[in-house]
From Swiss-Prot:
Source organism, top-level taxon: Bacteria
Protein name, as recorded: Large ribosomal subunit protein uL6
Disulphide bonds in the chain: none
Gene: rplF
Keyword hit for Ribosomal protein: yes
Amino acid sequence: MASHIGKLPIAIPAGVEVKIEGQNFSAKGAKGSDSYVVPEGITAAVEGNEIVLTAADDLRPTRAKHGLARSIMAGMVKGVHDGYSKTLEIVGTGYRAVAKGKGIEFFLGYSHTITVNPPEGITLKVTDANHVVVEGTDKQVVGQVAANIRKLRAPEPYKGKGIKYADERILRKAGKAGK
């Protein structure tokens, strides 16, 4: 019984260069490059225009690593080819974002402004005063940067003010009942 996810081959799109040297996997594409160390007990090989992963044995930890390695490598191939992005929406009177160098300055109703500088490989764009786009090749880092920005002023349930993902629905609560 092998890992259902791990046994699926990863298609290599045109324009993506893949290298496997021992346990080191690297992918290079139009959007950038990324590398990953394949866990022990898992071997990766390029067959035609696909990457195939095989597990050394059928033990549960190996099966788990098999599926994990396949998912991470598939994400890397997609990331260097297409890239990943998350859009954040700023809701609230006077709340806005302004591009400042490579970073973004947020005005979120605090007594001070908050400046966010992106890590290496991540770009931040302000499409308008109320929308910020986080882009990069690494899915995990893009999601983490977006989550850190959202955390600056998480949406509150009464008026929905704060920073939310563009596709996120905020569960609203009724205010207190008056007499």
